[in-house]
Amino acid sequence: MTAVCLVRHGETDWNLQQKCQGKTDIPLNATGERQARETGEYVKDFSWDIIVTSPLKRAKRTAEIINEYLHLPIVEMDDFKERDYGDAEGMPLEERTKRYPDNIYPNMETLEELTDRLMGGLAKVNQAYPNKKVLIVAHGAAIHALLTEISGGDPELQSTRLVNACLSNIEFAEEKWRIKDYNINSHLSGFIK
């Protein structure tokens, strides 16, 4: 069985400002760095084999901070980058809502493209690290899309907002992925249930 813990990156200033980040390469803020340390402190008590990360700064830095506690190889994979939001990138929520009330942004990566990319990435991880325990540091919409696909569109999961630096655990056994738990955030100071 391959076990994967999906870690959402720590907070950025754009998260606070409710700006659409997508593929825009925004760094962690001080809170995000603290969240990454708290995550590292929490996951160090479990056995891991490797860390896979999106190459975007906010995910990569989260992975590096977590790795201060684990001392593992880190592998970057483009498959786990955030969704490309096209013309909406950098736009605050209020402006996006006014301009695009249907949440469909010009030049945006489709949900099908995103899901195919992410599931392809998971397949590569499973092939490269069979029966291993893998931390994957990625992004909110990316993790949400993976969980939605694996769950078959579970309505409760679809309505859940994944908090920064939350953990979601999935495993591959009997030729399929399944969700163990998601949006775990009790390790974060000031966590939200």
UniProtKB/Swiss-Prot annotation:
Enzyme Commission number, as recorded: 3.1.3.-
Keyword Hydrolase applies: yes
GO CC terms of this entry: cytoplasm
Family: Belongs to the phosphoglycerate mutase family. GpmB subfamily.
Catalytic residues (positions): 9 (tele-phosphohistidine intermediate), 82 (proton donor/acceptor)
UniProt GO molecular function: phosphatase activity
Pfam families in alphabetical order: His_Phos_1
Observed phenotype of the null mutant: No visible phenotype.
Annotated protein name in UniProt: Uncharacterized phosphatase PhoE
Species name: Bacillus subtilis (strain 168)
Function (record text): Phosphatase with broad substrate specificity. Does not have phosphoglycerate mutase activity.
Key words, A-Z: Hydrolase
Gene3D superfamilies membership: Phosphoglycerate mutase-like
Binding locations of substrate: 8, 15, 21, 58, 139
